[in-house]
Amino acid sequence: MHKAPESVLNALVPMVVEQTAKGERSYDIYSRLLKERVIFLVGQVEEHMANLIVAQLLFLESESPDKDIYLYINSPGGSVTAGMAIYDTMQFIKPNVSTVCIGQAASMGAFLLAGGAEGKRHCLPNSRVMIHQPLGGFQGQASDIAIHAQEILGIKNKLNTMLAEHTGQPLEVIERDTDRDNFMSATEAAEYGLVDSVIAKRG
């Protein structure tokens, strides 16, 4: 599949012009929303994206440690280690991180959605959530494959335990439900405990 050059994608990002006492100032739309403490986690979860999200979380904490941060998620998932860097930072910083699923939150995206502050995790009505076990595909010597298999089993157990804590579901239920791809509607995700509510309009 042909991928558009980054310069083309950047050109498609809208700019917002504000009038200030010193004249006009322009921001790309994401930078302007960052001023409102809104962060977008969109696309594959990987190291570069994780570094950007972590940096934004730390910046907003330094700006105002007592104000909530709003993390909007539309992601098919991705790297567990990159996702855990974001997750750990969400738990580490002082501000509550409110998570909102727009579109989809699958795999590590769903884990980050569930990792938001208690009572502040939301889905929009037509979003989809999917949980499953970590994926692994390894090649090489048998001993190396065995090492990787052991590692992924350890990660699976850790993620399941953490998901049980965030959802309130028994660990054995999480283990059963993540054995294969498990898709949920926004309402089902709320009933399961992955989010606290489904919101159609701002209050």
UniProtKB/Swiss-Prot annotation:
Signal peptide: none annotated. Pfam families: CLP_protease. The active site is at residues 107, 132. Keywords: Cytoplasm, Hydrolase, Protease, Serine protease. Its main location: cytoplasm. Belongs to the peptidase S14 family. This is ATP-dependent Clp protease proteolytic subunit. It comes from Shewanella pealeana (strain ATCC 700345 / ANG-SQ1). The gene is clpP.
